[in-house]
Amino acid sequence: MDFFDFTKDFRREEAPSGFISSDPSSMATEMFESKPIKREVIGTDYVAEIAAKEKLLMSGQLKAEIPGQYSGGMDDLDSNDDMDDEEISKIRLDEEYYKKYRFNLNRDKNLPIYAKREVIVNAINTHQVVILKGETGCGKTTQVPQYILDEGFKSGQYCNIVVTQPRRIGAISIANRVSQERMWEPDTVCSYQVGLHRKQHLEDTRLLYCTTGVLLNSLIRNKTLTHYTHIVLDEVHERDQDMDFLLIVVRRLLATNSRHVKVILMSATIDTREFCDYFSTKVSVPPVISASHGRKHSIEKFYRDQLGSINWKDDPDDGYQARIPDEAYKAAVKIILVVDNMERQAANQSEQSYDDAKSQGAVLIFLPGIYEIDNMAESLGNMTKEEPSMKLFIVRCFSLMTPDAQRDVFSPPPSGFRKIILATNIAESSITVPDVSYVIDFCLTKVLVTDTATNFSSLRLTWASKANCRQRAGRVGRLRSGRVYRMVHKLFYKTNMTEFGVPEMLRLPLQNSVLKAKLLDIAPPIEMLALALSPPNLSDIQNTILLLKEVGALFPTVDGEYCEVDGDITFWGIIMSRLPLDTRLSRLIILGYVFNLLEEAIVIAAGLSMRGLSTEAGRGRLTSDAYWMNYVFADGSGSDLVAIWRIYRTYENMVANGMHQESAEPWARRYHVSLRALKEMHLLVQELKSRCSQLGMISFNLSSSDMPDDLEKAILLKVIIAGAFYPNYFLRSKKTTLEQERDIFHVISGRDPCRTVYFTNFKPAYMGELYTRRIKDLFQELKIPPESIEVTFQPGSQKVFVTFKSDECDTNCTRLINVPGQVLTEVYKSIRMRLYQSNRTFRVMDHNNALNYVQRHGIGTLKEGHWTPPSRPLNVEMLALPSVYEKNMTGLITHVDHCGKFFFQPKSFARCIQNMSEIINTPMHLQYEIQNAGVLTKGMMVLAKRKGTFERAIIVRPETQNNRQPKFFVRFVDYGNTDLMYIEQLRLMTKELLSQYGDLPPRVFECRLALVQPSTMSNTLSRWSRDAKDMLISASKNNIVEIEIYSLVYNVAAVMVHTRDGLLNDKLVEHNLARRADENFMSRQDHDFRIRKQESARYISGPERQQVNEEYLRSCQMPEDLDLTPPPLDKCNMIVMLKGPYSPLETSMFSTIRVGVWKTVKIDNSSVNAVLLDSDPQDNHDQLVVSHSTVESSNGDVLTARGTTLMPNIHGFGPLMTMLFCPTMQIKCNKDCTKYVSILAGLGFDKETMKPYFEEHDMVMNLDVNLYEDDVRMINQMRYNIDTMFFNFEGEELPSLNMNDRVTIYKELRKLVNRLLSKDRSYIELNASNSDFNWEKEDRIEPQPEPFGKRCIFPMHVIPELLEEDIGRRLYLIDNCKKLYKWRNFEGALDILNCKLCNMSLETTPQLRLHLLTQLHRDREKQIGFKNE
């Protein structure tokens, strides 16, 4: 019976088998149909015709459509093409306004821009568009708008100027600086407007600084430029999407209804030729004005080929790949050494000392990312070890750095140190450090690129542009002459590196730009984006439109007809365009409104859009403490998004309670949270609430009786997360075959995988039992106390097994961190510890010294050179455990912790318990009252008072030992309960009692309910609820209870509790307090063993049965932790490299969408799900994980899921969410049409060509539980209700429903969600097919009526009709079942049998027997009406 022997290796040959899994890559052979076809990239050939037409329009040779005429318009036009109105606007006088405020015409003449003042003013007066190129610091941003305003003052003409800034902080600070310079009251003549800081009263404002997005949204809303006389677009070189689209809008409106508005383009590094061509017409070319100023200090530039011996050799196969080899880091270190030596020598010939030169000679090293910063810091650290005289003050500088780190960047270094700043491209322009004298530029950058066909983003390492490098070089020479070292060859820099970077419109998602084009309503999105300065590929626009249809922003149709490259905008699309968020985050807010979780959705969306909420974010890996703070905030939800909500709520509560900065900072440091990011997040939350309110989206006012409780709210929150981020769905891989289940336990030699981890590479010759305490010390950094750890070994194995004990009275802080499922938190912490450090050094004695040590100290026994560790004697016949031959037992349930842990006292022990109690409670045995609490130690047996009499008890721990009367937690040995007792309620045991009862095992045994697990609908952590506990207590109140023993594993009996109304286990399922579940492999194996022994009991004599039972009970005992005193460290002369710890429950995920099926999936290192374990190992059903976003590796092979949420372990949850939130789907039946077996979801397909519209995002969910026609009807009802919530009549801006109707829909949705998720669904066999991704014609199926026609976001699903199982097929399956049971007790070699019910191949008799015990097979038997006689 090697199958059950965990000490032996287990191997098998692969054979066809069925199992419960949705993993397409593991269930089907790789065929052409199973992989997506690579979508053809269509370039920019479409642009030429559209651009030529636009040039004619700009020259006045072609009449333009009035904005809004393209599709009838959604907003009333504020302006039209009436030239008289523009003439009036142009000559409007504003003399009264100029008298109201002080206008001083004296400008700063020291600024370089002043020399060009007259040229600039004249050019603006005579040209529609002017291009101004001025170096950073010349004064263009503050002065040019003032020059224009001064001209207006002189002529008395109306002037209204708007100036855009790429960053919020820039708009605010510049507006304040101009107001201060002109001595205007803030927010009068000059003001600012940014997304999160909006001034309410701007009537008197004539000079407005705003972010690019604010102006863009204003122009889209008004569809004219004539609200302003002058539009100044600053920093146009940055080329973000908002700027590029703003240029499209400005150019179009200049050519249509705003010909007299003046536009000024400004930048330090503008490509003047490109912008001139863009705004040129046949009759007008924009003038270019340059304003520059010379530098006070010179800058020398050096390239790699000029570094002499510092240069390194290239790999001939490298081909100038964008990367930093190890030699390049070393070269940078050598440059610093050269610089230092150069300054040391110069100090001898200069008045400036060497120390002064160092303090002013900071080195700024530009690196592409955090990983490279860490590598550079490590190289510098190694150098300082070799050169102690080199004292370096190393500072990291990146976008997510903490405020303390920012201060270090600007602060002078400690005396005698040189400051080395390791920076990303944030230091190009956002940060200026005056004391930088040297720049080492690796000429690299990281850019975020999104594949529009997959919506996967990837951070790619690429060569920086020359413009980037010039900006970086400009960081030196502020206080003295400087040097720039570019770590590329000069020829490569000049010929291979591009002049400018790739604009966002060519590398980032285009959703927001397309939505803006739809709102502007001038032309279809393709025609609008073709007018961009750098038009995107046509395929990118097409893919973006598909993505917008997927999220519900666009209808699939235009005027009722399907259009591949366009779609009418939905009200969801309008909402998404008005919220400053990614479309999926806006979708989260929309669904939050639908399910009355608007507050939660807004906070989560704001948090996900913020960078740097965690102070450790952006680093290569989170520190242990920072990572576990995420767990604290996630509170067992398995969701990064819930953690964001709880962080914000904690911060908000502290602010409301008057928390000051002094107390806020320690809190933020403790929980590794950025206060700055939280404050920004708070502003964004307020902004989102305001915008939602304007859109009619406010929370419903419900009575207290209608409010969902916390449990229902937690499930609804995960429902809307699943809806918002469809199709970012992943399934957690399961151990789906019997062999895989067995392997879980084989790896840890039969121990409990939910509480055990293991190390490897520890040879038996090391005699590990000597070092158990030292192994426990490895977990000190996790704050796991040694008394909560058991360390054991397996003879002949190189593994060290570490098992964690659970104790409800334990004060271990680890227990304060909740995790979902059955796995202990300590296991998660241990695996996370390995991710930081996979190998741990461990000191041991060599084998000979160890043998001498144990012999000298009398530890264990030594025989013929073989050491046997000491062991405690065990009389298994004294254990109060059920015999292998006992199926049913009667007795008392003495104590209930919950349905997964209660204690049973067999009726046969009643007399023993009574006699022992009588002896214990005689006066002579109660005479030792405890005067000094110090005599009590953990684990000591005492007498404690229980219900008026004293009983045996074990000291668990003291509750307190201060000035108050001491209390102790004690566990009653013979009853199982733990209570807190005063010291006077305790007695020391007499010697007589100790000798008589001290070694007597407990007269109870621990039980749990078999074949059921807690319902997720009653507890999101998969813990047993109070209601379930009350039902068990109620069933045990009538004293004697009958239980049926299913199995005995780890001395815990899995039982069924009989009541007058049937099995309690079944009653809990009926009341939705439990769900039916498989037992784990060990339990099923034990159950099978017990059944066979019980069947053969009548053929075995009494003594033989007793011997078999003793052997059985002895085999149930696990090795003990000996807790020996370890040898002194000075005697441990060998170093062992321990590997681990590992868990057999470590698992992975796979993507459900077609484009991701064959890719490896990882979870972001900072996620609470980064340690992904199979938290319910006995449950062979898929569990859904949803990510906020997905990042693709540079080679495209690996996906990283970010912002993940582990969905509730409700069977069928993934398919139900897919059906509820997908654009459309087909539910497929088995070949007999008797059950639904899979779901194909996506945007649908062309009914003529049968090709999918968006095959990359088509998703397959194979069903492992039964779904019925009624389920699909409920899903359709919910989809209809969601659409109804946003229904509006033509011409109405907001939805038509009043608040009462919305509340009614919300209540109906809640009721339907509860009905769907509360069903106890029977298991079905897997029906995998290579055609799962093929859309099929549904001509024979009656389509569902569509209340909203083709203008619905969630159309009704077609419902295939299910047929009854054919009687012939049923008889065939019943006959197959009989055959399986016939072979069940066969002991010889077995030919492969097939279970036709479950599509399972069975190769051995043990496999057959254990398969027959699975919930899948039992459910299938029930479905065909089979009963084993």
Swiss-Prot record:
Residues binding ATP: G134, E135, T136, G137, C138, G139, K140, T141
Keyword annotations of the record: ATP-binding, Cytoplasm, Developmental protein, Differentiation, Helicase, Hydrolase, Meiosis, Nucleotide-binding, Oogenesis, RNA-mediated gene silencing, Spermatogenesis
Catalytic activity: ATP + H2O = ADP + phosphate + H(+)
Single annotated GO MF: RNA helicase activity
Any one GO BP annotation for this protein: oocyte maturation
Subcellular location per the Swiss-Prot or TrEMBL entry: Cytoplasm
Residues of the Helicase ATP-binding domain: 121-288
SMART domains: DEXDc (SM00487), HA2 (SM00847), HELICc (SM00490), TUDOR (SM00333)
Domain Tudor: 933-996
InterPro entries: DEAD/DEAH_box_helicase_dom, Helicase-assoc_dom, Helicase_ATP-bd, Helicase_C-like, P-loop_NTPase, SNase_OB-fold_sf, Tudor, Znf_C2H2_type
GO cellular component, one term: P granule
EC number: 3.6.4.13
EC category name: hydrolase
Principal location: cytoplasm
Keyword Cytoplasm recorded: yes
Short sequence motif DEAH box: positions: 234-237
Pfam (any one): TUDOR
SUPFAM superfamilies, alphabetized: P-loop containing nucleoside triphosphate hydrolases, Tudor/PWWP/MBT
Domain Helicase C-terminal: 349-521
Record family assignment: Belongs to the DEAD box helicase family. DEAH subfamily.
Role according to the record: Probable ATP-binding RNA helicase which plays a central role during spermatogenesis and oogenesis by repressing transposable elements and preventing their mobilization, which is essential for the germline integrity. Acts via the piRNA metabolic process, which mediates the repression of transposable elements during meiosis by forming complexes composed of piRNAs and Piwi and govern the methylation and subsequent repression of transposons. Involved in the repression of LTR retrotransposon copia.
This protein's name: Probable ATP-dependent RNA helicase spindle-E
Gene: spn-E
